[in-house]
């Protein structure tokens, strides 16, 4: 269809004057010759277009009524995006005592990144310190701490077909813009109300420049990872280690849009969502470690110990809709507020042991076992024992006659290992959602409860993952070629999956 209209997206007459598809042959006759240049009515010059939004007496109507608009390709995409930049700075300080018993390190890093999309940027500051001290009383102390602060902002981004039917996407609206529309030369704001305005007759696509100026998603993350350990050496063969680890994570989120946009309720009425996600992980670890030569041919290394892990997650925030005064991004400036809240916790206790046995440096056997208990499963199903074993044999280390110029190294290995996977949250109990309406009228507030569409499984068990592997490693042709071949089979018992359910059951999964 070569007929022009401000309803179109990516078609229309050619930009050349002549030819079958030239604008001089526009079937509708809308493109006219103005002093040798093809022109059309300015997209904001139609009184019917502007009257639909503001009534006849408005600034844009007065400015563009009767104005002509040159029919030519504009560099809208090229001019919308900008050149990105990245600045990265790092400083490292380290030192140690003359005897090596005391050492430390300090690192600082800064990243400042400006994206190629307007309104997009990332900044990160990172500080880490660490140290180690070997004391005269057989104790060794070491620790490390890393703190990072990351801030990120971006205009709306989502899956889109350009006209916004799938989601509010700045990219989609930019690439959907026809070549003959001067994106960067057209006003994007209606002066009377700050709303979005764009070229289409129905003003049914958000102007990308309005999105950049009026809507944003942002996130600031503060995170601390810290580890400290204390080791006591009873003698040269056996030691005891305690280690504590902390992972603290705080995520502050803010999404908003001013009102008077188009196409989406969030843009039309305005919204503000702010919420925090907080994660705390505390981990305690203690182990007894040993290493002995049982004979001239047999060596043994072992460790036994226990772990304790506690993980908590908390979300809290407010979602507000219905902006009252344009430009004021505060929760008190919205008609409706909905609280956001969620909490979960999981404790995991474990005991473990392992032994490594070697015979004449050519036969190696490893045995491992662990048992874990978790707090968010019923007592009859909250424990899992999972052992592992592996063996490796090096013929080339056992007998030099196996070696040659064409085979310098050969290792044959086999192993069977198991591990456990525990579900998070509270999958064995049904949950109830609670919503409040503080504006309940004369009868006061209304509290509504709803049952989750997820059906809990009180008989849920942890997953047991098992893997059997056989392999060969070799180096041939004077060590020029390395060969690694493996066969493995992996199985999962009591696999946890989300199963769709018919809605007639009252649940969906």
Feature-to-residue mapping (PLM):
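Glycine-rich cofactor/substrate-binding loops
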Residues: 180, 187-189, 367
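N-terminal, polar/charged subdomain of small-to-medium soluble alpha/beta proteins
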Residues: 263-264
């Amino acid at each position: 269809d070569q007929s022009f209209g401000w309803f179109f997206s990516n078609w229309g007459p050619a930009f050349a004057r002549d030819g079958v598809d030239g604008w001089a042959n526009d079937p509708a006759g809308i493109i006219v010759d103005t002093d040798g240049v093809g022109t059309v009515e300015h997209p904001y010059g139609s009184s019917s277009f502007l009257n639909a939004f503001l009534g006849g007496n408005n600034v844009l109507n007065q400015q563009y009524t009767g104005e002509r608009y040159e029919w030519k390709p504009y560099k809208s995409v090229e001019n919308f995006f900008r050149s990105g930049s990245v600045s990265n700075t790092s400083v490292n300080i380290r030192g140690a005592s003359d005897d090596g018993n005391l050492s430390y390190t300090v690192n600082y890093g800064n990243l400042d990144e400006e994206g190629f999309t307007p309104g997009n940027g990332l900044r990160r500051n990172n500080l880490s310190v660490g140290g180690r001290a070997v004391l005269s009383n057989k104790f060794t102390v070491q620790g490390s701490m890393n703190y990072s602060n990351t801030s990120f902002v971006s205009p709306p981004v989502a899956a889109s077909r350009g006209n916004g039917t799938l989601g509010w996407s700045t990219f989609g609206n930019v690439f959907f813009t026809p070549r003959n529309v001067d994106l960067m030369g057209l006003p994007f704001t209606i002066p009377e109300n700050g709303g979005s305005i764009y070229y289409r007759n129905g003003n049914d696509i958000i102007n990308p420049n309005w999105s950049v100026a009026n809507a944003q998603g942002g996130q600031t993350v503060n995170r601390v990872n810290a580890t400290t350990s204390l080791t006591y050496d009873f003698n040269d063969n056996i030691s005891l280690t305690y280690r504590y680890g902390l992972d603290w994570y705080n995520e502050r989120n803010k999404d908003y849009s001013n009102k008077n946009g188009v196409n989406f309720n969030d843009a039309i009425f305005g919204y503000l969502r702010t919420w925090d996600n907080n994660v705390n992980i505390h981990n305690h670890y203690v182990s007894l470690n040993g290493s002995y030569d049982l004979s001239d041919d047999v060596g043994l290394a072992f460790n036994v110990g226990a772990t304790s892990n506690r993980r908590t997650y908390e979300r809290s925030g407010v979602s507000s809709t219905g902006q009252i005064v344009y430009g004021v991004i505060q929760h008190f400036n919205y008609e409706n507020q909905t609280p956001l809240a969620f909490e979960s916790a999981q404790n995991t206790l474990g005991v473990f042991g392992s032994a490594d046995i070697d015979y004449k440096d050519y036969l190696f056997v490893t045995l491992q076992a662990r048992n874990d208990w978790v707090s968010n499963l019923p007592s009859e199903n909250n424990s899992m024992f999972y052992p592992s074993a592996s063996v490796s044999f090096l013929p080339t280390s056992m007998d030099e006659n196996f070696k040659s110029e064409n085979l310098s190294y050969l290792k044959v290995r086999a192993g069977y290992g198991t591990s456990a996977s525990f579900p998070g949250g509270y999958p064995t109990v049904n949950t109830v959602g609670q919503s409040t309406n503080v504006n309940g009228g004369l009868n006061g507030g209304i509290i509504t409860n709803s049952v989750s569409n997820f059906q809990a499984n009180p008989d849920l068990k942890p997953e047991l993952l098992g893997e059997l592997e056989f392999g060969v490693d070799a180096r041939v042709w004077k060590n020029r070629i390395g060969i690694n071949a493996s066969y493995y089979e992996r199985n999962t018992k009591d696999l946890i999956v989300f199963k769709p359910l018919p809605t007639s059951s009252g649940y969906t999964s």
